[in-house]
Amino acid sequence: MLHTLHRSPWLTDFAALLRLLSEGDELLLLQDGVTAAVDGNRYLESLRNAPIKVYALNEDLIARGLTGQISNDIIPIDYTDFVRLTVKHSSQMAW
């Protein structure tokens, strides 16, 4: 399943998101959700421990001035890669 987090993790039921993640799922951070990718924040450690790959939309990182602050564990992607993820996963959960 593809999970997309478009809101700040501080304004989301992040614990519920983590509970619903399964091995093989992927999480895309976009819009204000990219703030979860900032190195050193409290949500990042939980994402590191999850059995998933985590991506962040590069355009949203740039728009928020965060490109130099994200963790190396987060994979920046562009819109083409976003489309590939949506094609790969038949189901999606938006947060």
UniProtKB/Swiss-Prot annotation:
The UniProt record lists the keyword Lipid biosynthesis: no
SS bond list: none
UniProt name for this protein: Protein TusB
PANTHER family: PROTEIN TUSB
Gene Ontology cellular-component terms listed: sulfurtransferase complex
The family this protein is said to belong to: Belongs to the DsrH/TusB family.
Keywords annotated in UniProt: Cytoplasm, tRNA processing
Function: Part of a sulfur-relay system required for 2-thiolation of 5-methylaminomethyl-2-thiouridine (mnm(5)s(2)U) at tRNA wobble positions.
GO terms under biological process: tRNA wobble position uridine thiolation
One Pfam family here: DsrH
Primary location group: cytoplasm
Subcellular location: Cytoplasm
